[in-house]
């Protein structure tokens, strides 16, 4: 498994043509692992972002007003694609799989956004966040997706998910709502011609215990690949740093919730 882990912005230059994927926090590529199978695109690997090893505040750059009094991000990770050109009417397509070990009132969330060349938001394509029942897209307190999803309803596949990017949280679950979505297809029609960036992200909400992640694959525009691959390897120990502290603080959190 290749990882990119940092507490500041890093650029992974992917070719001699100055194309770049930018990462905040912890991201990488991986093959079939735990509950995350190979993507339906047939690719031998997929990209991922995880709150494990995430950067402080590394979530959406704004607080969604419907989330329990407006409490915001604590830590998280984002990955932004290389800049790509698109014409009005072009179809943006990708696949994602949201995985979480945190539930109940502390549910984390993942998302994808379409940004312009200056990184201004054009569309919040989807958000995924656990809720007591029904589709977790959108989750509680979240806006409706701008992208069309297949399947349209996305319930959580419950249980304590095992997945390496979750670090020490893999195989654990805080109360109800843990699990994964399985692979979901997203499609979005570009409104105006221009240059764009595709962003994937995941964040811890309210605290930093019990991690979540987002796998993604098959990012294309009008059928042409969008570069989202990270290529700068970081030893696994780097993104597992602090695991013992996480276990200790997780125990404190469980006690405080009792």
Language model regions located:
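N-terminal signal peptide c-region/cleavage motif recognized by signal peptidases
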Residues: 13-17
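A short, hydrophobic C-terminal helix/tail in secreted or cell-surface proteins
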Residues: 233-252
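Serine/threonine-rich, low-complexity intrinsically disordered segments
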Residues: 5, 230-233
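Short, charged juxtamembrane terminal tails flanking transmembrane helices
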Residues: 255-258
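Sec-dependent signal peptide recognition
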Residues: 2-8, 237-239
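Aromatic (Trp/Tyr/Phe) and Gly/Pro-enriched flexible surface segments
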Residues: 21-229
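Short helix-onset patch at the extreme N-terminus, typifying the N->h transition
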Residues: 6-9, 25-27
């Amino acid at each position: 498994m290749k990882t990119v882990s940092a507490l500041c912005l890093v650029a992974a230059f992917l070719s001699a043509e100055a194309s770049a994927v930018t990462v905040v926090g912890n991201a990488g590529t991986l093959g079939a692992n735990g509950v995350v199978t190979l993507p339906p695109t047939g690719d031998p690997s997929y990209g991922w972002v995880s709150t494990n090893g995430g950067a402080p505040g590394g979530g959406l750059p704004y607080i969604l007003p419907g989330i329990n009094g407006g409490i915001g991000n604590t830590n998280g990770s984002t990955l932004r694609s290389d800049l790509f050109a698109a014409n009005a009417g072009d179809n943006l397509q990708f696949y994602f799989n949201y995985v979480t070990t945190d539930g109940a009132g502390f549910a984390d969330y993942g998302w994808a956004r379409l940004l312009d060349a200056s990184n201004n938001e054009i569309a919040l394509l989807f958000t995924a966040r656990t809720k007591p029942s029904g589709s977790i897209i959108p989750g509680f307190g979240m806006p409706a997706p701008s992208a069309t999803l297949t399947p349209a309803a996305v319930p959580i596949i419950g249980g304590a998910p095992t997945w390496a990017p979750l670090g020490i949280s893999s195989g654990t679950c805080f109360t109800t709502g843990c699990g994964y979505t399985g692979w979901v297809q997203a499609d979005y029609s570009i409104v105006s011609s221009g240059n764009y960036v595709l962003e994937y992200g995941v964040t811890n909400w309210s605290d930093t215990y019990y991690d979540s992640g987002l796998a993604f694959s098959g990012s294309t525009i009008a059928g042409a690949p969008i570069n989202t691959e990270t290529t700068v390897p970081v030893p696994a120990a780097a993104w597992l740093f602090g695991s013992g502290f996480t276990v200790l603080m997780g125990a404190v959190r469980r006690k405080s919730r009792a």
